[in-house]
A protein has these predicted regions:
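An acidic, low-aromatic, low-complexity terminal/linker signal
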Residues: 1-177
Length: 177
């Protein structure tokens, strides 16, 4: 007979993962991550293959590609592109930011059998939203470059906007490769 392990009782339970926050009806789950110091983004969990920590030394730079492409790395025997998501969206390149970190979190997305790592400084929580509550982005809200990579936005309980990333458009940015 296998003995039960009581150590799980000592772990704090994060309210983000309680059953009451599980998807109901048309609700969908999204991974929340910071786009910059003021704005957070959301990535649909349905598009996510995984999240891994990536040291910059694991990324092999590729010459003569777009600036937002940091290079390729090996993930489970597969060569995948790692791109600087903030740079793609118009922010300062990872290596030129103040307080640059030697590692980040890559959100692995797959569209049409192509896996790409979207490098961000950190990932936060899994959140649940009703797609019917998604708001459209007006042309005056954001620069056109940023807006083209977004499906819209949600508003969190504190009234802050959460930008919904369109992973299909992000992957299309790689199509010339």
């Amino acid at each position: 007979m296998v003995q039960g392990n009581n150590s799980f009782r000592e772990l704090p339970i994060n309210s983000q993962f309680r059953l009451e926050n599980s998807p109901q009806g048309n609700n969908q789950r999204f991974l929340r991550f910071p786009l910059n110091g003021k704005v957070n983004g959301l990535l649909p969990l349905a598009d996510l293959r995984g999240v891994i920590q990536v040291a910059l030394t694991e990324i092999l730079p590729v010459p003569q590609v777009a600036e937002f492409l940091l290079g390729i790395m090996n993930w489970r025997g597969e060569a995948i592109w790692i791109l600087d998501l903030a740079c793609l969206l118009g922010a300062t390149h990872w290596c030129r930011r103040e307080g640059v970190r030697n590692s980040g979190m890559a959100m692995l997305v797959q569209v049409q059998n192509q896996t790409v790592g979207l490098l961000v400084e950190q990932v936060n929580t899994i959140e649940v939203y009703d797609p019917q509550e998604r708001l459209a982005i007006s042309a005056s809200m954001l620069p056109a470059r940023l807006g083209s990579f977004l499906q819209g936005y949600f508003v969190d309980s504190q009234g802050s906007p959460l930008m919904l990333l369109d992973t299909h458009v992000v992957i299309q940015a790689l199509q010339p490769l």
